């Protein structure tokens, strides 16, 4: 399978990365090189093979349902580009 | 005083106990070595001199009063991927501009609790995506090794290029690193240092910037096998904050060093004899086989038939996980924000400006293979192939093999801005051909220096072990180290 420039632009939109015409055209070539490389996986017979979910067989650990953390609003917003009174500020999203 | 920086961790431990020098003198020696060398090597992106002195003074107090801890006063460099409280933590990306976490990763917490001293944060490929340390926002790291008689700058490998270069150039006694497809072992091989990627789940991933969560593991890069064992003992732990941290006590790895390998079965996989591999690497591999045989190990030929599919499967699984992990960099909660007309444009502009070319490429691949209609054909198929890769190893171990010996990399270090590598991303990816299988199967792997090529550049061998059997790796790697000797770069910086 290979991708065209319109697919690349659509994927960039899904990934929320702004691309111009030049970026999209360069990425098309690069993505096709990588997709060409991974195509050899089609040679492998995977009938009846379970997809890997965890490299080390393990059961999910359970912990006691109790509050062990919190009251760190200051720490949480400390690295944000724009905040106001412990809220993250973003451009207006509703009209 | 400069000779202090040449001591191994085990030597530091003995000499600090004997009061031959103080922890502060040792730290000062490293800080001055960094000051002289870093402009040329670019291994450190930030040096925490004040913090280092403070920690060293605290170590001196401990040493004086008794009760020295296992890494008391040992100066370490930390890969920029580890969250360090109040200190630059950006995964060497522009998108994490000015990020200073309010918390400390579990691995570094363990190291400080054992008395280690932090010298600073080390350069790396952006978000650990790269095999040459050239994708860093802070510029490439220069390998302290050069060709005999040459003065061309070479890459130190990646993504832990800063860690490997700093250890090789005596700019820290040891370093933390991480390995998703070979990022500890390949740079170790390029710089004649020892690097171990432990079993998935051995070191906590809590507080390590995530790249591909099912593959990422932390481990040390060190001057020799013993130092790697000492560091891993401290870094590894059972951590309730990481659900993939496995509940098995951490053994005393150092105790495995020096144990006989008599009767151990060492597997030699025929699939690692790849086309176009330099004859020197093939010859080195044979030497390694002889060394193991001379030490009393039994050599057996094995087959890992799905080896060639590990790299293509990796280039689906790793980008898929990365595209999901890196969705959090949106210009809202931390790091860089570039304004736009609306919130979507703000996201798109921030991510376009904040991510480098290689990171964008991988996010794009990951987004594509996970998108509707392609998930089964790419992602699910790759995960099925991964099951087969793991099964290959399981069958070898079930047949009685204790460890597997392979070359660490298909070449020695190459030049910075290598044209062929830059023109073709797949060519760069092939660097990890011998290491990536280990991540796909979650197994431990160690790279140990084994010789120099005809140009005088280091080459390494890799040993792969059973899950949670790092001890056998230290034991066998030590045999190679003893037979091959140690290698040092000539100081030109």
UniProtKB/Swiss-Prot annotation, chain A:
UniProtKB keywords: ATP-binding, Ligase, Nucleotide-binding, Protein biosynthesis
Enzyme class, broadest EC rank: ligase
A Pfam family it matches: GatC
Domain of life per record: Bacteria
Gene Ontology terms: biological process: glutaminyl-tRNAGln biosynthesis via transamidation; regulation of translational fidelity; translation
Cited SUPFAM superfamilies: Glu-tRNAGln amidotransferase C subunit
InterPro entries in alphabetical order: Asp/Glu-ADT_sf_sub_c, GatC
Keyword ATP-binding in record: yes
Record field: catalytic activity: L-glutamyl-tRNA(Gln) + L-glutamine + ATP + H2O = L-glutaminyl-tRNA(Gln) + L-glutamate + ADP + phosphate + H(+); L-aspartyl-tRNA(Asn) + L-glutamine + ATP + H2O = L-asparaginyl-tRNA(Asn) + L-glutamate + ADP + phosphate + 2 H(+)
EC number: 6.3.5.-
Glycoprotein in keyword set: no
GO molecular function: asparaginyl-tRNA synthase (glutamine-hydrolyzing) activity; ATP binding; glutaminyl-tRNA synthase (glutamine-hydrolyzing) activity
Family membership noted in the UniProt record: Belongs to the GatC family.
Assembly and binders: Heterotrimer of A, B and C subunits.
Free-text function comment from the UniProt entry: Allows the formation of correctly charged Asn-tRNA(Asn) or Gln-tRNA(Gln) through the transamidation of misacylated Asp-tRNA(Asn) or Glu-tRNA(Gln) in organisms which lack either or both of asparaginyl-tRNA or glutaminyl-tRNA synthetases. The reaction takes place in the presence of glutamine and ATP through an activated phospho-Asp-tRNA(Asn) or phospho-Glu-tRNA(Gln).
Protein name: Aspartyl/glutamyl-tRNA(Asn/Gln) amidotransferase subunit C
Species of provenance: Chelativorans sp. (strain BNC1)
The organism's taxonomic lineage, starting at the top: Bacteria, Pseudomonadati, Pseudomonadota, Alphaproteobacteria, Hyphomicrobiales
Swiss-Prot record, chain B:
Record carries keyword Cell membrane: no
Gene Ontology MF term list: ATP binding; glutaminyl-tRNA synthase (glutamine-hydrolyzing) activity
Biological process annotations from GO: translation
Catalysed reactions, semicolon-separated: L-glutamyl-tRNA(Gln) + L-glutamine + ATP + H2O = L-glutaminyl-tRNA(Gln) + L-glutamate + ADP + phosphate + H(+)
InterPro entries associated with the record: Amidase, Amidase_CS, Amidase_dom, AS_sf, GatA
Lineage: superkingdom: Bacteria
Active-site residues from the entry: 79 (charge relay system), 159 (charge relay system), 183 (acyl-ester intermediate)
Family per similarity comment: Belongs to the amidase family. GatA subfamily.
Quaternary structure and interacting proteins, as annotated: Heterotrimer of A, B and C subunits.
Protein name listed in UniProt: Glutamyl-tRNA(Gln) amidotransferase subunit A
Gene behind this protein: gatA
